[in-house]
Design a protein with these regions (language model features):
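Catalytic palm active-site di-aspartate
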Residues: 92-105
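N-terminal lobe of the biotin/lipoate ligase/transferase fold
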Residues: 1-91, 107-108
Length: 108
């Protein structure tokens, strides 16, 4: 599986950009990366504060082709990201449910 990467200088939100690309291209997999996000989305309708220099990233994939219960996908994704980061950063990275990663008690 090859994931198509979309790189932007600035987006309203990586989530909204992913939705727009899915509708426009019909791709099954992709990754949105941006240098800045103006109006990010948190959980339960909360606003996500975005600071320049942070990582702004959304993955999208066709869940109809995945045989994992939808409620498990968020945790699996978070743990996969933790594993990836741990290859470059050797400090302890803590998973905090439902989808946060912490280093030294600070959300990353």
């Amino acid at each position: 599986m090859k994931i198509k990467n979309f790189k932007f200088k600035q987006v309203v939100s990586t989530n909204k950009t992913a939705i727009r690309i899915i509708k426009k291209t019909k791709l099954n997999y992709g990754m949105i990366i941006s240098d800045l996000q103006r109006n990010g989305k948190g959980q339960h309708g909360k606003k996500w504060i975005s600071y320049k220099g942070n990582l702004f990233l959304s993955f999208f994939f066709n869940i109809n082709k995945i045989k994992i219960p939808i409620n498990k996908i968020t945790k699996i994704n978070c743990l996969l990201v933790r594993k990836l980061i741990s290859k470059f950063y050797k400090k302890n990275i803590i998973f905090k449910s439902p989808n946060d990663l912490l280093i030294k008690k600070k959300k990353i």
